[in-house]
Amino acid sequence: MAVTKLVLIRHGESQWNNENRFTGWTDVDLSDKGLTEAKQAGQVLKADGYVFDFAYTSVLKRAIHTLWGVLDELDQAWLPVEKSWRLNERHYGALQGLNKAETAEKYGDEQVKQWRRGFAITPPELTREDERFPGHDPRYANLSAAELPTTESLALTIDRVIPYWNETILPRMKSGERIIIAAHGNSIRAMVKFLDNLSEEEILELNIPTGVPLVYEFDDNMKPIKHYYLGNADEIAAKAAAVANQGKAK
C-alpha cells in the first residue's frame, strides 16, 4: 500500500498571539519567536527527509511568512504556492483586537471558551462599516458580499475550508504531489475535524500548537490512516496547553 503524506502547520507565534489578542482576519506578522518556530519547523522537516511539490497558504502574512521560513530551511523557496482566503483564520468578529484574558475577566472563562472553541457559536458581529470588516480590504475585492464574514463559528469556517480541500487540495494529492499547508489554528481544526470525523465535543478540546508540523498519512483511497506531530513531544504538549490557556482570566 502506497502512503501519501500531507503536512499541516499552524503559523508561528504572531505579534498578537504574544499579546494574547483575538486576531482572526487581522493581518499581523510573526513575532521573533514565531520566525524562529518557522525555521525550526523547516529544520525538523529537513532532518526527516521531507520534500514538497506544492504549497498552500492563506492570504494572511503570518501564515505566508511561516511557509517562507519552512521552505527556506528546506531550500525549496522556489516551490509553487497557492494563497486562498478560504484557508484564513476564523473571523472573530467584534472580538478582533481584544485581549483574551481581559475578555474572559469581563464575560467569564466559559463564555470565552465557547466563543473560541464552540462549534456553532459565533462571536459578536462586526458591522459592515467597521474598519475591521474585510470588505474594506483590497485583497478580498473579488469576494461576493455573501462570502465576506462579519463573524464566524468553526462550523462556518468548515463551510469554506472543506470545499477548498475537496476541490483543490485533494486532487493534487491524488495525482501524487507532496503537499504542505501553512494555515491557522481554526482552519487547521476545520480540516482535522473533517479528516478524523471528530464530534463537536471532541473538536472543542482540540488545540493546535504554533509552528509544529502535523503529518497526516493517507491510504490509496485517500482515507487518513494516522497523524502525528514532528518534534519533541513534551514541548508540543506544552505549546498546545498554552493555546488552551490563552482564553482564561488571569
UniProtKB/Swiss-Prot annotation:
Q: Which reaction does it catalyse?
A: (2R)-2-phosphoglycerate = (2R)-3-phosphoglycerate
The pathway to which it is assigned is: Carbohydrate degradation; glycolysis; pyruvate from D-glyceraldehyde 3-phosphate: step 3/5
A GO BP term here is: gluconeogenesis
Q: Any idea which UniProt keywords this protein has?
A: Gluconeogenesis, Glycolysis, Isomerase
Q: Name the EC number(s).
A: 5.4.2.11
Q: Where on the tree of life does the source sit, at the highest rank?
A: Bacteria
Q: Site described as Transition state stabilizer, positions? A: 184
Q: Which PANTHER family match?
A: PHOSPHOGLYCERATE MUTASE
According to UniProt, the name of this protein is 2,3-bisphosphoglycerate-dependent phosphoglycerate mutase
Source organism: Sodalis glossinidius (strain morsitans)
The gene behind this protein is gpmA
